[in-house]
Structure formats: structure tokens, C-alpha cells
């Protein structure tokens, strides 16, 4: 974008952001935002990457800062482009949002550990709260998580596993 007043070019490069899909017992960790944009809406733990910070490191840091949980960051879920704010300050801030699956490392309890977080909750795929922050991409991220939950292998019962392991008796 070129400023008409000073004829200076301003680049609207996407700012890298990282987030984590932390699940426990089939439920997903979400945080309620305490500040604009999207104050009061539910979001995944995440935020902007620090200069020269790898998105995996940023995802783990953001989870720790927002919830006090230590996580092991796993596979990438996907990347989405969006705007940081719907309008007003920050509306021109384009973001590249990179999401990872993550698992809890340790036994620590969640607690809002940041002024950016008003509340923390664990939600089943069919009971995700509303409103959601960042409607330009978060619903798609959550849909990807739900689809992965539906594809995940379900543990079979001990009886059926045992039956599969038995070798049939030979017939003579």
C-alpha cells in the first residue's frame, strides 16, 4: 500500500501466529479472550510468534503463558490466512495462523495465567462454545480437529482384541 501523503510503500506482510489444539480425554482446550479483538469469544491458545521464534516454540510458549500447561507440540494441523481484527485498529494486520496438535506434558492443572485469558475450558467436539473468535479461520481449524477425532481409531474391548490374537485350533 502506498501512502498518498508521503508516497511511502507500506507492506502488509502476514504476521506469523501459532496455536495449539490440546486435547485430553476427547475434549479440546479453549480459552476465553479477555481483550479485543474478540473479547469474550472462545479461542485456541496461541498468539504471535516472537522475532525469529519457530512456530512450534511459539505454540508451546503461548499455551504455557495462557494456561500454565506444559505441552509437547506434535504434528501440524494446517495453516490459515486471516485478519487480526474485524475492523478498527489491527484490521489491516494480516496473519498466517499455523496450528499444531499438542499433548500435555506433566500433571499440572490449567489456570488462566495471562491477562489475555478470562477463562479456560475443555469441550467435546459436539459441545464447542459460542461465540468463537476469528471467524475467518477458527471454524475451519475446529472442523479439521473434529474430522480427525472422528477418524481416530477407537480402542476395542479386551475381549475382541483377545479373540483376534487367538490362533484357531487345527482340525484333523
Can you say where each PLM-predicted feature lies in the sequence?
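Conserved beta-strand segments that form the floor/walls of ligand-binding pockets within enzyme
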Residues: 2, 29-30, 43, 75, ...
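Active-site donor-binding loop signature of nucleotide-sugar glycosyltransferases
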Residues: 5, 33, 46, 102, ...
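Conserved Nudix-box catalytic region and its N-terminal flanking loop in Nudix hydrolases
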Residues: 23-65
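Acidic, metal-coordinating catalytic segment for phosphate/diphosphate chemistry
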Residues: 1-19
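Charged phosphate-binding loop/patch that engages nucleotide di/tri-phosphates or the phosphate backbone
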Residues: 140-172
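Residues embedded in well-ordered beta-strands
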Residues: 19-21, 27-29, 97-101
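Unchanged
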Residues: 49-75, 80-137, 141, 170-172
